[in-house]
Design a protein with these regions (language model features):
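VWA/integrin I-like adhesion module and closely mimicked acidic/polar interface patches used
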Residues: 207, 226-275
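Acidic/polar low-complexity segments with low predicted structural confidence
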Residues: 1-112
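Short, contiguous acidic/charged loop-to-helix segments that flank catalytic cores in large enzymes
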Residues: 121-129, 188-198, 209-211, 227-239, ...
């Protein structure tokens, strides 16, 4: 079971930013929001999954902390106590120690937010277990660092979609406002493969929500196996998804794709994903390799 959340948080306000409006090939898409219920079994499974990635969590925490440290160094370069105040009149008024001021210490807070977007289509059936571990790894890492984030899963209802309307379902797995609380994590275990995937729509929705956040850096990480597939979408889906990614980047959102699998990844799939995401596409065979693959994206 799940509860409909059209008015939950910003769930009901999609399409206010014209840059991300659903039009053209997506003009007849309807959006339904859900919050999946957490079962006792989800809670048990979550503990197992968390234990599976405990070492990777430590690695990813270190990588993000390095990113924070580098920002510190850039900001404090050549200054003994912090950034030089613009108003040099203070030199004459106060003693010289007050000439410098420190920006708020960011060692425990990182002025960034993340949205994880998970393709919950049928083609993910053999990749979902590994993807869930990757999402748990991210959630636990960001929670440890006190970084607010949102996790959404998306699919299109293949049985209800027709010329008139294409219902797309967004599952709110982790709510931004509650993302650093303990009790939310087990909802990640509700992720399961459903029907089709209209990636361009999901990316526009996630981007619009990200732009409502006041953080300096915004990351959108799409966990997907590549090719979009939905009603009347197959031919133009790749182009539509590419356009959604490019639009998000124009607004300063850092977008990249993560393909997590235990199986070798074919060249055809790699090429499709590169066509959409450019160089910011990660192909990872096994969640244990995810931190090392992410490092260049976060530290570039």
């Amino acid at each position: 079971g799940s509860e409909n959340t059209l008015d939950h948080d910003e769930g009901g306000f999609i399409g206010q930013n014209q840059a991300f409006a659903l039009k053209g090939i997506n003009k007849d898409v309807s959006i339904e929001w859900n919050i999946p219920d957490i079962t006792p079994q989800n809670m048990i499974d979550y503990q197992y999954s968390k234990n599976d990635v405990q070492f990777e969590i430590k690695d990813l925490i270190q990588i993000i902390e390095k990113t924070i440290d580098r920002e510190h160094e850039d900001e404090r370069h050549n200054l003994t106590k912090g950034r030089l105040q613009k108003d040099l009149i203070n030199w004459f008024i106060d003693d010289q120690f007050k000439l410098f001021y420190k920006k708020q210490d960011l060692s425990k807070t990182f002025d960034a937010t993340f949205t994880l977007l998970i393709d919950a289509s049928a083609s993910m059936h053999d990749k979902m277990d590994e993807t869930i571990k990757g999402v748990v790894l991210f959630h636990e890492t960001l929670k440890s660092l006190n970084i607010k984030h949102e996790i959404l899963a998306f699919n299109e209802d293949a049985f209800e979609a027709d010329q008139r309307q294409q219902p797309n379902i967004i599952d709110e797995i982790i709510n931004y406002n509650y993302s650093i609380f303990e009790k939310e994590g087990p909802r990640i275990m509700t992720l399961e493969p459903q029907d089709d995937n209209r990636d361009g729509v999901a990316i526009r929705i996630a981007s619009e929500r990200l732009l409502q956040r006041s953080h300096e850096q915004r990351f959108l990480i799409v966990f997907s196996d590549g090719e979009p597939s939905a009603f009347n979408y197959s031919q133009d889906g790749i182009l539509d998804t590419y356009e959604a990614v490019e639009r998000a980047r124009k607004f300063g959102i850092e977008v990249f794709n993560v393909f997590l699998s235990q199986e070798p990844i074919t060249e055809d799939i790699e090429q499709t994903i590169h066509n959409i995401y450019g160089q910011f596409a990660l192909f990872v065979e096994g969640v244990e390799h995810l931190p090392s693959h992410l490092s260049p994206c976060l530290l570039y």
